[in-house]
Amino acid sequence: MSVQIKKFAILGERCSGTNFLEESILSNFNLTHTIEYGSKHFFCFNKYDKANTGDTLFIGIIRNPIYWLNSFSKELYHIPEINRSPLKNFLFNEFYSVDDELDVSNNNNTVFFMNSHPYTYKYKTNTKDLNYVTGKKYKNIFEMRKLKNKYLINIMPTQVKNFILINYEDLLYNYDQTLSDLKLKFNLIQTTKKFEIVTKYKKSETYKFVRQRLISFPENLIKLLWANLDVNQEAQLGYFMGNNNAHFKTKYIVNKDVPNTDSCNESTSQIM
């Protein structure tokens, strides 16, 4: 007798659509979100007892590499100071993540707004986001993407009973069909008459969800990025050389004219 799925956990890199996915599932299905199995971003060292995961749906999510790098380079979550700037460091330095520890010399929080007394940060290497093969730092962000994608493709399905890997673009452009597929495949209980579309970020009433940032990388940089990506793996995931989602080979009919809804003022025309 199959066990009814009651919980879900998400696995995906930063800036890969994990928050959008979480809100979409919570808004439409009778499931609770769990973090009992570990971090959604730093998942390669998580521990799973396959025999006891029957009531949990594990969803991996990946994103077009150019859009992902474009966003991640501007939203530098858990990135050490040395890799934050210039862009060349972010792309080609040894890649590792840090735990952000706020060091406040004055307990009066108003000092944050005084330029003469800003908050300072102390960084500690996050050992759960090291190379899971060697236990060392990744050569660069491209090796990190390749190995963590490999984990989601090949290893994660062997660790738990209910796992599926989806593309952020499918969820974004084929929302109803993607949620319907999840519902049918895993016998999920839908709580809405029709699927509700997420518009607000993490239940915020003011912070609207941004579907895609406008690509700010110049064409020569995009070509350089593809030269460092594992093109065979990317093709397996549905991504091909190009700088827009028209190159995403979704299994559904998509609207290729969906506009970007956010632009970034950062200049990334050079990587030096």
PLM-predicted stretches and their roles:
Residues E13, R63-N64:
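Glycine-rich His-Gly loop
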Residues L57-I61, I164-I166:
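Hydrophobic/aromatic beta-strand patches that form the interior of the parallel beta-sheet core
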Residues M1-T56, S71-S85, F90, S204, ...:
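PAPS-dependent sulfotransferase catalytic core
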Residues N64-Y67, L171:
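Conserved nucleotide-binding/hydrolysis micro-motifs of P-loop NTPases
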Residues L69-S71, N174:
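Active-site-adjacent loop/helix micro-motif of nuclease/hydrolase catalytic cores
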Residues M1-K7, N131, K136-K139, K150-Q159, ...:
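PAPS-dependent sulfotransferases, especially Golgi type II membrane carbohydrate sulfotransferases
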Residues S24, W68, T178-L182:
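Alpha-helical scaffold elements adjacent to nucleotide-binding pockets in ATP/GTP-utilizing enzyme cores
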Residues I82-I189, L221-I222, L229-Q233:
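PAPS-dependent sulfotransferase catalytic domain
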